[in-house]
């Protein structure tokens, strides 16, 4: 069982990419070291966390509010739009592009074993942006459950607290995959009612 008090002291990125994903998805499937060589002397960076499960790849970008002091709701909304909806979804799109453009993307899992993560090996890529904001984040931002773009497709947007609850409940990797498939299906069907 994860010690949540200890986990709260960790950075969100470390907590998600190493602790929770290793517990939920097993360390052999988690790739938290995300830099790879694309050409001699050139290094590129994938999203913050990548989880490879058979022919499904989970790609996660994590945004944490560095200044969690009592900012105004307006400042928090600007942070959310700029960092979560803007920068994080762009980083997901960049990762998707790297996965397609490169024939080989060799990364070590948490055990140090090298895997090739190029996109041709996966029938499905599930995309997430996880965020941790201050308490002053407006409800309108919290209601944004996904982002859709021509290049990135459907990208789940979740508060880190929600992700942690899901991770606690869905201990089996296949259950997590099914949950996020269903979440995408339902949010797509109800798009006009969701904060999209």
Segments predicted by a language model, with ranges:
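Intrinsically disordered, low-complexity Ser/Thr/Pro/Gly-rich regulatory segments
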Residues: 1-196
């Amino acid at each position: 069982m994860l010690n949540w008090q200890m986990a709260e002291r960790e950075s969100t990125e470390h907590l998600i990419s190493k602790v929770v994903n290793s517990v939920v998805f097993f360390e052999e499937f988690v790739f938290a070291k995300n830099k790879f060589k694309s050409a001699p002397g050139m290094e590129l960076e994938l999203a913050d966390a990548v989880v490879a499960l058979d022919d499904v790849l989970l790609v996660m970008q994590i945004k944490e509010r560095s200044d969690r002091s009592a900012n105004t709701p307006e400042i928090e909304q600007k942070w959310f739009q700029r960092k979560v909806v803007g920068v994080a979804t762009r980083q997901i799109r960049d990762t998707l592009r790297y996965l397609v453009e490169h024939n080989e993307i060799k990364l070590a899992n948490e055990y140090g074993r090298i895997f090739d993560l190029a996109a041709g090996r996966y029938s499905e890529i599930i995309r997430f942006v996880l965020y941790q904001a201050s308490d002053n984040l407006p409800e309108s931002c919290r209601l944004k459950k996904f982002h859709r773009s021509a290049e990135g497709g459907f990208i789940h947007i979740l508060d880190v607290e929600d992700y942690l609850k899901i991770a606690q409940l869905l201990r089996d990797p296949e259950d997590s995959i099914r949950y996020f498939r269903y979440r995408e299906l339902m949010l797509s069907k109800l798009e006009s009612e969701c904060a999209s």
